[in-house]
Amino acid sequence: MSMRIVSALIDEVHGLEESVLITGVGKINATKALEREFARSPFRLPDLVINYGTAGKTTESLNVGDLYEVGKFVQRDMMGTELGFKEYETPFDATHVIENGRSNLTCGTGDSFWTPKNKEIFEIVDMEAYALAKVCQDHGVEFRCFKFVSDGGDPDEWKENVGKGSVLFANKLKQIREEETK
């Protein structure tokens, strides 16, 4: 099985002994980088894209310093309610929630650093996962996503923890590769 690992920042994967596509921060950068990668070899797309990165938690049921697999993805900054659409629903797009069936954990992706406001429908927040999941869905490529919870909406906490999850992710990759050979 061919696999491509994708992350927003080199700081998130520092020390990882893998080839990683670094996309840059945000939905547009993530989309652009992965589409460009797919366009380079359109007849040899990877079987699997794995996104790894940091995420903020919106609930006390998750722990800063733990690695989680995400199974659902929404755009947390998509607001078309004035047009009669539901919160987080992209107007005139059939796909509002992308699910891979790997877990019930939902990631809200947006182009701003999330800060605690109110109860959300998602447990973690990031700035790239929904965009990457959408590109993979459009190309028929399996998508998995692992997020290291770095903070609870505190930018200083994120800065302190951004590089601490790569060892956990390296262990998860080893486990995935071992399962693949069975």
What do the predicted segments below correspond to?
Residues 1-4:
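Extreme N-terminal starter segment of soluble prokaryotic enzymes
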Residues 6-10:
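Structural motif
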